[in-house]
Amino acid sequence: MLAESDPEAWGDAIDINLKGVYHGMRAAMPHMLKQGHGTIITISSGAAHNALEGWSHYCASKAGAAMMTKAAHVEGAAKGLRVMGLSPGTVATQMQREIKASGVNPVSEMNWEDHIPAEWPARTLLWMCSAAADPFLGQELALRDEGLRKTVGLI
């Protein structure tokens, strides 16, 4: 709960999920702009758009990163930068086992087989680096979208 949240944990989420994205972009963009091209892909989350109990720090930090991705697209597209985000959804990783054990919100109630395989985000990220993803520049792509899964060749 936000009222009982740990300020240090909140700060860590902002440092990693928001400031980490900022520092990565800030370090790479000058070089990309100088060469006239480059691709930036950020990792978003459905939590950037939907508040979840017990995850205020994660939701807020991911929402900030999603907006930064849009801002980078607005600032860089005309200068040759390709910027977009990927919201992979829930991926079958150790993190999901930890979330399940926490019992905090509806994500913890999901069955293991409801999570997507880790290979799907990896394959999608590679696809996003190609010209085939150009119609999606400036957007956040969600692997929950069956149409995207088909476009990428996952299903």
Regions inferred by a protein language model and the residue ranges of each:
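A short helix-coil junction within the Rossmann-fold of NAD(P)-dependent oxidoreductases
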Residues: M1, A27-G36
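C-terminal helical subdomain
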Residues: G85-L86, S102-T151
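Active-site helix of classical SDR
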Residues: M25, S61
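Active-site-adjacent segment of SDR/Rossmann-fold oxidoreductases
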Residues: N50, A71-L81
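Residue(s) in the substrate-gating loop at a strand-loop-helix junction
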Residues: S45
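Active-site loop-to-helix junction immediately N-terminal to the catalytic Tyr of the SDR YXXXK motif
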Residues: S5, A51-C59, A71
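Substrate-binding pocket helix/loop in short-chain dehydrogenase/reductase
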Residues: M1-L2, D6-G11
